[in-house]
């Protein structure tokens, strides 16, 4: 028990200090322990390892899942063995007690019966026939769920690439577990496709990462389509911001396009007059607006609006 407690303390310290290599070593050493249900409760190692299944480091989360599954199998196997041995011991004790408590008269009766039937042909007992008909059953154990394990990338830019995969895993994770592919597999494929397209971790690679992560978090339909293989990874990596946008965002952009085309007048600063915006201060719809590209080129422009009502002059902006 002391070894398990020491391993748990070392694991918690390594996680707290950010020493992930030491944490992985502790998880691997924990596989050698003979774990029981009582040990998990008394040492609290089950709680410590269970929390790490959702850790940001892929290696630690994978090893934690693997270790929990192994412990489940060990505990189920121990429970089945204990039940079998206790039932066997109980039946043996009952048989012995019955034999010892038999009265002398019953012994004489059995002796006389055996003498009368000694000349008869012997036959197999009915109990043996029944045993042949119904063979002994073995307790069934549920197989552990198959966890998706990701081998960390090594070589040039390994840290950045592994971080990219982790960000994609977070963006792809949903409450729906019944998907064709786990988020980890899709994240690895997207990163590999981006790395090939942009020939390394370039400026374009990083810009695309930010754009993909933003749109995946905002668009549930796009996220599920990727996880269910309704959209291929290659097609996803070739999509622009307009293709990845959710239906609500597409509708909003259509309105902005309409505002641009229906603008009645342009000022010196390229300001368009419209009645499509309502001022939050005076509640009137006399406004001018202009659009500027304040962020990267693959993101929508920022719209600046000014109320034209005399005495108001309220200003606001939105993306």
From Swiss-Prot:
Gene3D superfamilies membership: 2.20.25.10, Conserved domain common to transcription factors TFIIS, elongin A, CRSP70 (1.20.930.10), Transcription elongation factor S-II, central domain (1.10.472.30)
Keywords: DNA-binding, Metal-binding, Nucleus, Transcription, Transcription regulation, Zinc, Zinc-finger
Ranges for region Disordered: 78-146
Protein name: Transcription elongation factor A protein 1
SUPFAM superfamilies linked: Conserved domain common to transcription factors TFIIS, elongin A, CRSP70 (SSF47676), Elongation factor TFIIS domain 2 (SSF46942), Zinc beta-ribbon (SSF57783)
Renumbered zinc finger spans (TFIIS-type): 275-317
Gene Ontology CC annotations of this record: nucleus
Listed GO biological process terms: regulation of transcription by RNA polymerase II; transcription elongation by RNA polymerase II
PANTHER family: IP08861P-RELATED (PTHR11477:SF0), TRANSCRIPTION FACTOR S-II ZINC FINGER DOMAIN-CONTAINING PROTEIN (PTHR11477)
CDD domains: TFIIS_I, Zn-ribbon_TFIIS
Domain spans labelled TFIIS N-terminal: 1-78
Start and end residues of each TFIIS central domain: 160-272
Key word Metal-binding present: yes
Described function: Necessary for efficient RNA polymerase II transcription elongation past template-encoded arresting sites. The arresting sites in DNA have the property of trapping a certain fraction of elongating RNA polymerases that pass through, resulting in locked ternary complexes. Cleavage of the nascent transcript by S-II allows the resumption of elongation from the new 3'-terminus.
Family the entry assigns: Belongs to the TFS-II family.
Molecular-function GO term, any one: zinc ion binding
Low complexity: bias regions: 78-106, 133-146
Annotated binding of Zn(2+), by residue: 279, 282, 307, 312
Location within or outside the cell: Nucleus
Primary localization class, coarse: nucleus
Origin superkingdom: Eukaryota
Protein encoded by which gene: tcea1
């Amino acid at each position: 028990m002391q070894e398990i407690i020491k391993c748990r303390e070392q694991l918690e310290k390594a996680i707290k200090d950010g020493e992930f290599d030491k944490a992985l070593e502790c998880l691997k050493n924990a596989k050698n322990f003979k774990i029981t249900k009582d040990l998990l409760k008394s040492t609290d190692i089950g709680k410590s390892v269970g929390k790490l299944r959702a850790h940001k480091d892929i290696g630690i989360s994978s090893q934690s899942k693997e270790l929990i599954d192994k412990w489940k199998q060990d505990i189920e196997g121990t429970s089945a063995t204990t039940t079998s041995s206790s039932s066997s011991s109980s039946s043996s004790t009952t048989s012995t007690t019955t034999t010892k408590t038999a009265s002398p008269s019953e012994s004489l009766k059995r002796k006389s019966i055996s003498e009368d039937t000694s000349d008869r042909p012997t036959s197999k007992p009915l109990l043996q026939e029944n045993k042949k008909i119904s063979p002994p059953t073995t307790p069934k154990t549920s197989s552990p769920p198959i966890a998706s394990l990701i081998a960390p990338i090594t070589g040039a830019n390994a840290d950045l690439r592994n971080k990219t995969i982790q960000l994609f895993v977070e963006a792809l994770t949903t409450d729906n577990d019944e998907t064709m592919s786990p988020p980890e597999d899709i994240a690895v494929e997207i990163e590999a496709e981006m790395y090939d397209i942009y020939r390394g971790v370039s400026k374009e690679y990083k810009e695309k990462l930010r754009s993909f992560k933003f749109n995946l978090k905002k668009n549930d339909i796009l996220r599920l389509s990727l996880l269910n293989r309704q959209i291929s990874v290659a097609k996803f990596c070739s999509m622009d911001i307009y293709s990845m946008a959710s239906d609500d965002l597409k509708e909003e952009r259509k309105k902005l396009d309409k505002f641009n085309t229906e603008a009645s007048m342009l000022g010196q600063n390229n300001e368009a007059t419209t009645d499509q915006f309502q001022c939050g201060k005076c509640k009137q719809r006399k406004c001018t607006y202009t659009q500027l590209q304040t962020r990267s080129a693959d993101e929508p422009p920022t719209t600046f609006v000014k109320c034209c009502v005399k005495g108001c002059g309220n200003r606001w902006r939105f993306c």
